[in-house]
């Protein structure tokens, strides 16, 4: 076959392109190119980011996990006269040394630590059934409402002074199972939480920054993390803030996969 005939045959093959079942098939390519309009992982995240900025009564949860003596699922300890509750936080490798301490220490971060409760993860353990280590870590990122590129792969479990905790919601009370979609009358401009933090200012600062930048997060403002997985019902894990200078005591630092396997035993 002459060079000209080979070229004509190749051109004809390229023209013989078929669209079958939403998949573009071409003799010019060895791979099928998907033309599906289904949202991608990032699109699900971006939709959650937009939705989270519009809290309303229909999104209010009545199933937030309370931090109270009545909640028998919680783990407590006492250091001196300080009552401390067990919480956890997903972290990166660079943060591990901060928690590798045998004694109590004070955290130092202006906006506080966002934390959750191991007991709350335990009641959601079914979310990880059948997943391998990679998929399970990704699922935890989704459930916490973190950004898709987040590289956190460790979990620090530690006790924190319970008097320094508040809920990052319109009602910052930690002993209830719900928060409204607007500030209660008693949460005025002078209301403080967690050892003197002006709550309304903290809240306004978060509204101005949480949804912006490379690490933007869909903060629901209602006491739970925004689970942005495609088939999730929006409500992730109950979340709390440990304020700057809170006293903490590390219990364990482990990989995400080890943490999850303990939940699913």
PLM segments and residue spans:
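Short active-site loop/helix that positions an aromatic residue
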Residues: 118-137
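Conserved NAD+-utilizing ADP-ribose enzyme module
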Residues: 141-265
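Bacterial N-terminal signal peptides that target proteins for export
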Residues: 2-15
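Short, flexible loop/turn elements at secondary-structure junctions
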Residues: 91, 114-121, 159-164
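ADP-ribose/NAD+-binding catalytic cleft of ART/PARP-like enzymes
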Residues: 31-115
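Bacterial N-terminal signal peptides
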Residues: 13-23
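N-terminal post-signal-peptidase region of extra-cytosolic proteins
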Residues: 101, 134-144
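C-terminal motif of bacterial Sec signal peptides marking the signal peptidase cleavage site
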Residues: 25-27
């Amino acid at each position: 076959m002459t060079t000209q005939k080979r070229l004509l045959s190749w051109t004809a093959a390229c023209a013989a392109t078929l669209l079958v079942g939403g998949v573009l098939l071409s003799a010019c390519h060895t791979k099928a190119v998907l033309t599906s309009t289904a949202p991608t992982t990032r699109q699900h995240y971006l939709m959650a980011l937009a939705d989270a900025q519009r809290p309303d009564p229909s999104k209010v949860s009545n199933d937030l996990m309370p931090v109270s003596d009545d909640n028998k699922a919680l783990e407590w300890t006492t250091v001196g006269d300080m009552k401390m509750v067990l919480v956890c936080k997903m972290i990166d490798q660079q943060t591990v040394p901060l928690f590798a301490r045998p004694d109590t220490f004070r955290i130092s971060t202006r906006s506080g630590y966002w934390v959750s409760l191991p007991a709350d993860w335990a009641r959601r353990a079914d979310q990880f059934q059948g997943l391998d280590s990679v998929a399970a870590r990704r699922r935890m990122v989704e459930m916490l409402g973190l950004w898709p590129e987040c590289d956190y792969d460790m979990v620090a479990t530690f006790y924190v002074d319970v008097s320094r905790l508040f809920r990052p919601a319109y009602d910052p009370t930690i002993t209830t199972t719900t928060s409204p979609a607007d500030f209660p009358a008693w949460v005025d401009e002078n209301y403080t939480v967690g050892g003197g933090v002006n709550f309304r200012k903290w809240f306004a600062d978060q509204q101005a920054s949480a949804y912006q930048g490379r690490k933007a997060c869909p903060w629901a403002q209602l006491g739970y993390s925004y689970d942005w997985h495609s088939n999730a019902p929006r409500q992730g894990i109950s979340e709390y803030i440990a304020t700057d200078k809170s006293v903490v005591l590390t219990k364990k630092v482990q990989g995400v996969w080890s943490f999850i396997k303990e939940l699913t035993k």
